[in-house]
Structure formats: structure tokens, C-alpha cells
Amino acid sequence: MSVPDPASAIEVKEKEKEDAEKFSFMAPVTKAPKKQIQFAEDMQEFSRFPTKTGRRSLSRSISQSSTDSYGSAASYTDSSDDEVSPREKPQTNSKGVSDFCVKNIKQAEFGRREIEIAEQDMLALISLRKRAQGEKPLTGAKIVGCTHITAQTAVLIETLCALGAQCRWSACNIYSTQNEVAAALAEAGVAVFAWKGESEDDFWWCIDRCVNMDAWQANMILDDGGDLTHWVYKTYPNVFKKIRGIVEESVTGVHRLYQLSKANKLCVPAMNVNDSVTKQKFDNLYCCRESILDGLKRTTDVMFGGKQVVVCGYGEVGKGCCAALKALGTVVYVTEIDPICALQACMDGFRVMKLNEVIRQVDVVITCTGNKNVVTREHLDRMKNSCIVCNMGHSNTEIDVASLRTPELTWERVRSQVDHVIWPDGKRVVLLAEGRLLNLSCSTVPTFVLSITATTQALALIELFNAPDGRYKQDVYLLPKKMDEYVASLHLPSFDAHLTELTDDQAKYLGLNKNGPFKPNYYRY
């Protein structure tokens, strides 16, 4: 038997040591307990903040806060303070003012940063502020508003204040308010009454607090959906004796105004912002084209490629939704009542079907019609398991959610703004935001596009407030074409765009003023 060489043994051991160091990343971890203890401490640190459903896990904390901070700062709203209604909590801002009701005034600093970020992409409103530093066209205006309360609308509200107006504000949607932004507005002195997750009773209470003031009488209304206008007509009709005009943003609210006008019950001029070119062709189309995907991804993590989706309605909102979904490889069906819109959908490459014909096979149902009961209980009963149902229209009437609140169906909240409605046989439908507006309830929207709409609203308020007697009668009006063009021109510098100027001869040939308007009122963009 041969005797091993000691020198060789040493070389072998050194070689094994080198290999162990070289490939140490492949070796099993043997000193994990210390790391695990440290990780457990980290989890305890994150779990110190309770939620309604118990302690929040580390991974869910990170996911929830990073996802929801854009919409409502979930890190704030998921606290034990949720158990106490803001109506029951006395709050004052740093100046001792208490004429507001928000979730938590302590969030104001964070909300101010959100507003400052939005201002960077809303340069048209900032330009309006600068141009009106000397002359304040809204001096004397007392504007009561009911819109979504987000960082973008906060820039609009503060612009109106900078132009001389006094404002009182509530939310037009119980889920779309950014609590930190509402707090920042309250800290700045705006009488704001809104928080995310209001009850129906809270919703009308907030509107009432904006209107029912003995020492403060509104003379302008800025509405989104018509709820504020409806409340004033129903509860305080005498307020309209001093109202100079109404500015309405949404198709739902505009429809209600035209109904009032047709019944000869509209007693003040109203400006239809929804059908202005700068709202229809930009906000309704481009905003929805980007935000529909954002809302669906944040709430459901859905994979779009290969999915079958039906979009109810092919107006500008429907067009934006369909374009976004088609680009990601979905099979898109469209339902329509209007043959012109239906033909547009066909020529854009979409199958136009009745909802009953595709309801069993689609994976996602999106409504954007502005109508009621577009998706009925019968449709919901026939949907496939795990079908996602959501709404991109303003009102929550498009999906018959009330029909789902019956004893035989079980509601299970699985995420913020995500409910599983479970049938007795185990089938479940995924309902987003309880049928309310998806993008502002569950995600966020592009700031630049909202700048266009907000600037249009500001100019409409200025026009109605300063219009001489007799210019506008008790009817619904579109924004003058010249103002639409002015709004567009304010946003062109962001793209370094340079307009071509007509020569005198060209202007004469076209029968136009060199400075616009450049299209007749009947022109379809």
C-alpha cells in the first residue's frame, strides 16, 4: 500500500478551498437564522400599522403603497383612522380654519408635493395665472364645484383662486378623491369636503356643506356629472337667483342639462364643456386610451394578449379603450346603437356585435356609453367564470350592480376596489370599483391631457362670469370655437410645435381671419 505524499495532500486541500470560494454562490446557506431573524424584525416594523382586515404583510405593504399612492395614498387611508368618519373628527388647518372636512389634514404636506408635480405638466393653467396677475377676471366669483378631487383638479382650483375666485368644493365620485390632495387644499384655505370611500349619505352631505352657507352665496357652478346642479335645483332652488352660469364637464351631466332645457326648467346659461373639441378629442380619447390599461393592470394584473374583450359604446371614450386594447393583442368586440359609430368601429377593425352574442365568451366587459343598465343581471348571470366587469363612463348606472346585492350571491373584497361576486355554483365575476369610473377610482390619468380639459373649464367660467347681460340666454351652449383654439395653442409649446401663418391672400381665399377661428362651427375634427 502506497503512503500519501503530505505535500500532495496540502495541495488538494488548498485546491478544494479555492474551489469552495470560487463557487461559494452555489453552496447552501448555512447561516440563515440570523438573516431570518432580521427579516422578521423588518416584518414586525411594517406590521405595526393595522388595517381593517388585520396586520399587513411586508410584501402587500410595499405593493399597496406603491400602487395606490398615486390615487389615494393607501399608506394613509388603510389606517385605523378609517374607523372614524371624517364628519366626526374636528380638524383645523395651521391657520386655525375648520371650514372643511377631509380624511386627515396631516397629509397636507404630501398632497402639496403631488400638486407641485402635477403643475409641471399643466403649464397652460400656470400661464393663465401669470397672464392674470394684474387683472383678475374672476374677482367676485363664488364658485361651488363638484368634480374629481385629484392633484390635477387641485391645480385648476388654485388657478381659479389665483384669478380672483372664492371656491367651495366637493367630490363627484365617492372613490376618486386623493385624500392627501384634499388635505393640501384645506391647508391652503379652500373649503373642501371630500374623502375617498364616502358613503352615499356622506356624498350628499358634502355637496350640501358646499351650498348651504348663509354668509356665502355661490354665483357660479362647476359640475362633473350634474349631481351638484341636481341637488341645488332640488334643495335650494332660490340659489339660482344669483347664479350666473353652470359649466358642465361630463356627458352624463350635459344630458341632464339638455333635459332641463327641453322642459323649460333651466333658469341660467350653461356651458357644455364635454362636447367642446378640446374635451372630446383629447380628454375622452387620449386620456382613456392610456388610463384603461393602467386601471385594469393595477386591480387585476390581467394579461391582455389573446384575451377577448367587449367594449360597450364607440364614442371617443370607447375609441380610446379599443385602440389601447387592440395594441396589446386583445380580440375586441364593440356594441353600439348608432350606425355611424358602428361603421367607424367596423372600419377600425372591430367586430360590432350585440352584447348577448358575446357575453358567454369574453374575458373582460367595459362600459362607456353614458346610459343605464347596459350590463344587466341577465348578462352577469351568463358571464364566464372570472370575467372582469368595469365601467369607463361617468355614472355608476351602466352596470346593474344593485341586482347583485341579493342573498344568494356572496361578495368578497379581495383588493382595494376589487370585489368577487360569487354565484351559488362557485362562478365568480370580478367587479371593479363597484361599477364606478375605473380610471379615477383605481389608478390615475395623464396630467397633460387633464390640463387641456381644466384650461377649457377655467375659460368657460371666465366667459360666463364676465359675459354682458343678454349674450347667453337660459340654454346650453358650446364653448366658442376661438376659445377651443386658444386652449390648444397654450399646449403646443410643450411639443415645441410651430404653427404656419396664413398670408393675407390665403386668408382672403379661405374667407378666414388670419388669427382664427380657422374652422366653422359645423366642422368635424
Task: Describe each model-derived feature in a short phrase.
Residues 146-165, 280-283, 287-372:
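Glycine-rich phosphate/diphosphate-binding loop of Rossmann-like nucleotide-binding domains
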Residues 78, 90-138, 169-307, 486:
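Glycine/serine-rich phosphate-binding loop and adjoining beta1-alpha1 elements at the start
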Residues 21-27, 39, 45-47, 53, ...:
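Rossmann-fold NAD(P)-binding glycine/threonine-rich loop
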Residues 66-71, 80-87, 92-99, 107-124, ...:
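Adenosine-phosphate binding glycine-rich loop
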Residues 215, 219-226, 348-405, 409-410, ...:
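Rossmann-like NAD(P)-binding element
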Residues 173, 337-338, 395:
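Residues in the short beta-alpha loop(s) of Rossmann-like NAD(P)-binding domains
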Residues 1-97, 102, 525:
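Eukaryotic N-terminal low-complexity, Ser/Thr- and Lys/Arg-rich leader segments
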